[in-house]
Amino acid sequence: SGITRICVSTGNIGQSSSFYCKYMRFAEIAKGSFDRESVKKLYKLDDSAAEYRMLKNSEQDCILQLIQFEKNTGRCIRDTANPWDYGYLDIAVQSSDNMKACLDFTAMGYKFFSTPTHYCADWINMDVSEGVMFGPDKLPIAMIQRLKEPIPKIDGYFGNMTDCAQVIRDMDQALKFYGDILGRKLVFDDTMPDGLVDPVVQVPYGTHSRLAMFLTPGYPVVELIHHSIEGTSLKETARPENLGIFATCFKTDDLDGTLQVCSSSGFDVIRESVVHELAPYGKIRSAWVNGPSDTIVEFFQTL
């Protein structure tokens, strides 16, 4: 499968769920909670219970998991980070009208990391407008509007998730992980023309940016971004107790086999497998792996 779940720590689960359901065509399909003992086993947090809600649109198989921990710090993972720092970056969505979205959400009090910018995405033969909004908990949401046919019909502001992006220290290592180990299909890998996406991603002039994409039909693209400018790892910040994307999850039919292959390839298991209940899947076994550029990647198997 592709990205089965995107895990987002939130400071106010009700407000966050309302935002995604109202503006991004998600529906709440399940919810649940973890007691303190479970949170310690699953998330390595002491003395903190948690509640979660599972959101999903009608066209994709990826779930957005919102989870609120009692002992969250209130600190946003990318609040003080540079956009070229290594770790999960944003969730991208189709947009019907970027300028209208920018005006309307600004009026609602939301801030923009970058206002809509037009560029020609030759790798998909598309003219696009792209801007990045800070959504709930300052989570970056990239809005991508197609300006050239085929233009999808979108009711409301936003459509499907297009990708979940991460900034990578070592592109070859990341390609090995998602391609060779996980067997995902690489559909794009190239260096962007200088300056093309600089206004969107806010990197210094003269930065060379390489982009790679892994596509699994029915799921958001795994988007990998490598910049020539050196960044800093967000490993110590991109933790469950801080707000934002802290993990992506993949379903497997053989958890032990997957963990063995990851470990033998240099991607260590950082949280051993635990059997637990998770709606809407029922009973599962899950474990964490230290993925490319120290990102948390969860693998789980339904039982």
Each predicted region: which residue ranges?
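N-terminal beta-strand motif that seeds the catalytic metal site of vicinal oxygen chelate
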Residues: S1-S17, A30, Y86-V93, A142-L175, ...
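Vicinal oxygen chelate
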Residues: G2-G11, E51-K71, I77-F105, V128-F134, ...
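Core segments of cupin and vicinal oxygen chelate
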Residues: S9-D61, C120, I124-M126, Q166-Y219, ...
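A compositionally biased, intrinsically disordered/low-complexity signal enriched
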Residues: Y20, M24, E28, L66, ...
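Short loop/beta submotifs within extracellular cysteine-rich repeat domains
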Residues: A27-I29, R36, C62-L64, T73-R75, ...
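A cross-kingdom feature marking solvent-exposed beta-strand/loop segments within repeated
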Residues: G32-E51, E70-L89, M99, T106-S129, ...
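Internal, hydrophobic cores of structured domains that mediate oligomerization or house catalytic pockets
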Residues: D127, G131-Q145
